[in-house]
Amino acid sequence: RRNMMNNKNAGNILADLQRLIDNGISIHTQVVLCPGFNDGKILKKTFRDLVALAPMVETMAVVPVGLTKNRENLPELRLFTSVEAQNIISQVEKWQDECRAKLGKSFIYLGDEFYINAGMNLPRAERYDGFPQLENGIGLSRNFLDEWENSSAAPTGCDKIENALVPVGESAYKLLKPLFDEYNNKYKTGHKLVAVTNHFFGKTINVTGLLTGRDILNAVSDFTEFNRIILPQVVLNKDLLFLDDISLTDFKKLYKGKVECAQNAKELKQLLAKQGG
């Protein structure tokens, strides 16, 4: 931790956590897992150290390191392989079972990227215990899939539906493509899910929330037969700005078509079912 953060005090994290606990503060923790640095035996020790601080340490999230293209003079890191992701899932599932028996909850939760990278099914919703780290992206995919499944929104007049482009990160594309194929086949619509390559931060950054306005515009520019786009709300901040400081207002001017935003699966399904006009 000291090496990765280039901070001689970064190794004092357990003392820092204990100080918070001593002052009555409960904590949700997150580990950014890096191959060869803090995985394997180090991850096991981290888990043991944190679970020993339960219940004041309420949860432990584990997410894979994301590497941007801007890494000059930084420690050399790499991404996890699919096999490594499978092994991590297998180990964490054992710890979850142990915690569910002792604490009544999983306690340790993996980022969605591990399951997508491993090509494995996401855990059931109950394994997320109410999604306490949803804001950190833990269980976001499971939450979306269940919300999509439970939403009853459907076209009432398919011939009047205005087909839309839906840009997402490459990770979400793998998850959502089967849903879109099934939807289009069922309702005879022609909505288009678009996988957007992240040129701003680097091609290995594949989450939707880190897409920029310009990268989205570039990705949809070839689909001139569409005049409507549905943006995931997560690409905008509270001031309706993308990460490259393009405003939603400017985006609408540049796209020159209808621009709508969906906060979640329910809203997306409602917009997909919306009639044109």
Question: Where do the language-model regions lie?
Answer:
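Aromatic/hydrophobic pocket-lining residues that form the small-molecule binding cavity
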Residues: 13, 43, 85-88
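Catalytic cores of alpha/beta
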Residues: 39-51
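Auxiliary Fe-S-binding modules of radical SAM enzymes
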Residues: 53, 66-277
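Short, surface-exposed connector motifs at secondary-structure boundaries
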Residues: 24-29, 160-164
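Core AdoMet radical
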Residues: 1-20, 26-38, 57-65
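Charged helix-capping and loop-helix junction motifs
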Residues: 8-11, 44-45, 243-248
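Hydrophobic side chains in well-ordered alpha-helices
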Residues: 13-16, 46, 176-179
